[in-house]
């Protein structure tokens, strides 16, 4: 009787050892599987982080460039208005002060204006002057009736090649809302005013001007002052021939900010996000104090001018600490 008992205990002990080995193996296998999963996940995260860092390093803390179609020779389907806000939300928050596609857009338009043949240039210039006179008579707007292209403001000069493109599309019967919305994606953040957008449409020969102006108003209402200011060309590396345009754009930006922050007191105006942003850019660009003061005086009350200039002269906000 003792021998079976001893044998039974021996077999039981062996079975227990076997079970321990099995559970140990299962535990090791499970841990290995988890480690593999964790390693795979970490590797993916590192890859994404590496990509993000690359974008930060190469693109100055902005997302990869998303170019919208501007080629007016393309046939585009008209996008639903419901997608407008989505398109704006995707595009504008990802853009930084050094976003270059608007710079490229202006460069392209200025280049096309310089090489434009004399006959179409004269034709579109006459259309522009005619549209100016029509708007002045019908809308009581003050326009300088220039006799030469060089006398036009930088923004008005850009209207000529753009209007010529749109006019060609109209003559082909191919112009549609998609062309216009795509173009507005560039005109609005670059600071084109409502009257200039209307002038562009009239110069191009559009009949239903108000319908297209309505799209401009709708898009503009969805763009905040901060988003618009992100497209400034306030950069120390700006090309010298863009200085005049840059100054004009700054004037428009300050006017926009003044209207957006009309209810903010003079004591706290420089602490707002949008004013803080523009002062950072101005400080980086070492913008002349006297020129900034003139622009401010045309856009806001005296007490706010004093507050902004005081902060700017003191070097606030200092870009080195941002």
Curated annotation (Swiss-Prot):
Glycans are attached at residue 73. It comes from the Eukaryota. Residues 1-25 form the signal peptide. Induction: Expression is up-regulated during plant colonization, 3 days after infection. Keywords: Glycoprotein, Host cytoplasm, Host nucleus, Secreted, Signal, Virulence. Disulfide bonds: none annotated. GO terms for cellular component: extracellular region; host cell cytoplasm; host cell nucleus. It is found in: Secreted; Host cytoplasm; Host nucleus. A motif (RxLR-dEER) lies at residues 43-62. Its main location: secreted. The keyword Secreted applies. Belongs to the RxLR effector family. The RxLR-dEER motif acts to carry the protein into the host cell cytoplasm through binding to cell surface phosphatidylinositol-3-phosphate. Secreted effector that suppresses pattern-triggered immunity (PTI) in plant host. This is Secreted RxLR effector protein RXLR-C17. The lineage of its organism: Eukaryota, Sar, Stramenopiles, Oomycota, Peronosporales.
